């Protein structure tokens, strides 16, 4: 049980996919200007990352490995991710049309979010079992959500702050992301 807790903590804080592995930067920078959009994107990405991680494990274990089709791994994982994203988009559209409009193009772009594919491929490389794959996917999603929500809250405050003209917009956003990354480096010794 403690092994699973350590895996979750290390995935969320120590090996954060956005700040340490630099995966998922497109939605991180694109959706983080408003807190409401960031929360919606976080929920959608959490659902997609967790479910895609589980389904990718099952596809790998029960289709690719038994039939020696490892060379189709990346393509099959992208197909799994696309199906999960389409399902998520249909659910979001039915439950909250306002959220669907707020997320706009970023919801279908979860398909091309490298963090989702990265989690699926890293599960295979790390040789995680089913439960570890689910925890790793969920931990990556929680870490992504945590960073995205914190960053969007900071960007909203920065939009109202008196920032020098050369630093407005993307420049101050990148500086803030770098400072967040430094802050998360403080968790490095937390899990061995």
Curated annotation (Swiss-Prot):
Keywords noted in UniProt: Cell inner membrane, Cell membrane, Electron transport, Membrane, Translocase, Transmembrane, Transmembrane helix, Transport
| Membrane-spanning ranges | 5-25, 39-59, 65-85, 102-122, 134-154, 171-191
Q: What is its main location?
A: membrane
What is this enzyme's EC? 7.-.-.-
GO cellular component terms attached to this protein's record: plasma membrane
Q: Belongs to which family?
A: Belongs to the NqrDE/RnfAE family.
**Complex formation:** The complex is composed of six subunits: RnfA, RnfB, RnfC, RnfD, RnfE and RnfG.
- Name of protein: Ion-translocating oxidoreductase complex subunit A
Species in which this protein is naturally found:
Shewanella oneidensis (strain ATCC 700550 / JCM 31522 / CIP 106686 / LMG 19005 / NCIMB 14063 / MR-1)
């Amino acid at each position: 049980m403690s092994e699973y807790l350590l895996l979750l903590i290390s995935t969320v804080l120590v090996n954060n996919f956005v700040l340490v592995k630099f995966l998922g930067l497109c939605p991180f920078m694109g959706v983080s200007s408003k807190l409401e959009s960031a929360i919606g994107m976080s929920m959608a990405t959490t659902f997609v990352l967790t479910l895609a991680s589980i389904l990718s494990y099952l596809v790998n274990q029960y289709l690719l490995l038994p039939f020696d089709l490892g060379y189709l791994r990346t393509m099959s994982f992208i197909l799994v991710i696309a199906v999960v994203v389409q399902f998520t988009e249909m659910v979001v559209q039915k439950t909250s049309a306002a959220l669907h409009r707020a997320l706009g193009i970023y919801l279908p772009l979860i398909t091309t979010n490298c963090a989702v594919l990265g989690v699926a491929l890293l599960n295979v490389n790390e040789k995680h079992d089913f439960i570890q794959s689910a925890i790793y996917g969920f931990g990556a999603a929680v870490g992504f959500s945590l960073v995205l929500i914190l960053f969007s809250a900071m960007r909203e405050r920065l939009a109202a702050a008196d920032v020098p003209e050369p630093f407005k917009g993307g420049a101050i956003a990148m500086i803030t992301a770098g400072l967040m990354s430094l802050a998360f480096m403080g968790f490095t010794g937390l899990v061995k």
